[in-house]
Amino acid sequence: VNKAPTLFVNLERSGLSFQRRLWQVNTALGLDPQRKMLFINARGHTLAELGNSIRESVLRHSIQVVFIDSISRAGMGSLVDDRTANSIVDTLNQLGVAWYAIGHTPRADATHIYGAVHFEAGEDIGIRMISQESPGSLGIGLEVVKANDIAKPKKAYYRLTFDNAGLSGIETAKETDFPDLMVQEQPDVTERIKVYILGQPKAEASVSDIA
């Protein structure tokens, strides 16, 4: 993993909310809580309005990675329109650096991004995120669903823990730690049982454990 100057374009939430979240993430990762990150906080504005400002920030701060939260705030038209999808992808490509754009899924189908197929056609790497809540923690699964010029890595799982102040810890996890993640990924019951058993010590599990 290479560290690089990063810009996060926040179109969804208040700047104060993101400063609080950054403090919590830094603390959970064992970093200096005051560690800075460059943001453009523009809740209520659109990617179309901020294009020039983003490009200027990329040049001024030698940014190498840009995050956009999210494409639903692009302000370039209906997301189901092919021309809108192409315009958004073109705008991001014009930044001349690596970019990550957060997309949302339709209510009826969590396997792809809401909108035109050209969103997925225009991405080099597509990552699907799934989650499962449990008392005091949140299980996260990340799966690379598209990879143009790299080998697809294995699925990654993380456990986020929380206290009264918010996020307090981040650690790696196993898919068997969060059974509902297996349901989302593998609806076939037989395959889920197989994965669960193989994830146990000595690859053994009782009937009650499986149930």
What are these regions (language model features)?
Residues 59-62, 133-211:
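C-terminal regions of RecA-like/P-loop NTPase motor modules
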Residues 72-76, 104-107, 198:
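A broad detector of the eukaryotic-type serine/threonine protein kinase catalytic domain
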Residues 65, 82-169:
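Phosphate-binding/switch region of NTP-binding enzymes
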Residues 2-83, 87, 174-179, 187, ...:
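Conserved inter-motif catalytic segment of the P-loop NTP-binding fold
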Residues 79, 96, 201-204:
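Residues at alpha-helix boundaries and short interhelical turns
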Residues 6, 99, 205:
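Hydrophobic anchor at the start of a short beta-strand
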